[in-house]
Amino acid sequence: MYTAIILAAGRGSRIGFRKQFATLCGKPLFMHSLEKVLDIFEEVILVLPEDFLDKVKVHPKVKKVAGGPERQDSVFNALLQATGDIVVIHDSARPLATKKMFLEVAQLGDYHGKVVASPARDTLKEVVEGKVIKTLNRSLIWHAQTPQAFRRDILLECHMRAKAEGFVGTDDASLLERYGYSVGVVEGSYWNVKITYPEDLEMVKKIMGCEED
């Protein structure tokens, strides 16, 4: 069985407000991702700020779980409630992820996990204190996105090990990498942008044709 986990518990520290509840084309931002997974996966978990659990009304199929102080804590809380053999984790701040991405990343094959990612287009520099150290090999660099999918037992083990040693990864795949598990890649789309700043939200509105929001 598959479990989809939609993360919508962020504080919005960089954008200045809880972006998951911002209106995008007539509905809350998080709802765009939630609606895509409802008819794909058997179990759906929506991770919310604890004080929003009773305020947010969703489909009866959706299990609401309180998030934690950080993203990693929120995923861990959801994993404890998930029952699927494979979990598909997605940041609600990426409303342009397609159903095709969710379906493809969930097919793990021989991997312990898979991520949606896009090959780097720009020349990338390693910079320390304002000084360019070297140019990275662009052909080896991919921009990781979500959704990401994992064997639940493996990801839960990695989360527990990370918690024990105080390690915080920037995404869930980084935990598997740290502990020697295999992670595959599904090529995503450059349109699958993450809304981090106000201008990102305005750009996505233009892409979706709902600038009037």
Curated annotation (Swiss-Prot):
The keyword Transferase applies. It catalyses: 2-C-methyl-D-erythritol 4-phosphate + CTP + H(+) = 4-CDP-2-C-methyl-D-erythritol + diphosphate. The keyword Ribonucleoprotein does not apply. InterPro entries: IspD, IspD/TarI, IspD/TarI_cytidylyltransf_bact, ISPD_synthase_CS, Nucleotide-diphossugar_trans. GO terms for molecular function: 2-C-methyl-D-erythritol 4-phosphate cytidylyltransferase activity. Keywords: Isoprene biosynthesis, Nucleotidyltransferase, Transferase. Pathway: Isoprenoid biosynthesis; isopentenyl diphosphate biosynthesis via DXP pathway; isopentenyl diphosphate from 1-deoxy-D-xylulose 5-phosphate: step 2/6. GO terms for biological process: isopentenyl diphosphate biosynthetic process, methylerythritol 4-phosphate pathway. The record marks R14, K19 as: Transition state stabilizer. SUPFAM superfamilies: Nucleotide-diphospho-sugar transferases. The record marks R138, K194 as: Positions MEP for the nucleophilic attack. Its EC number is 2.7.7.60. Belongs to the IspD/TarI cytidylyltransferase family. IspD subfamily. Catalyzes the formation of 4-diphosphocytidyl-2-C-methyl-D-erythritol from CTP and 2-C-methyl-D-erythritol 4-phosphate (MEP). PANTHER family: 2-C-METHYL-D-ERYTHRITOL 4-PHOSPHATE CYTIDYLYLTRANSFERASE, CHLOROPLASTIC. HAMAP family: IspD. This is 2-C-methyl-D-erythritol 4-phosphate cytidylyltransferase. It comes from Aquifex aeolicus (strain VF5). The gene is ispD.
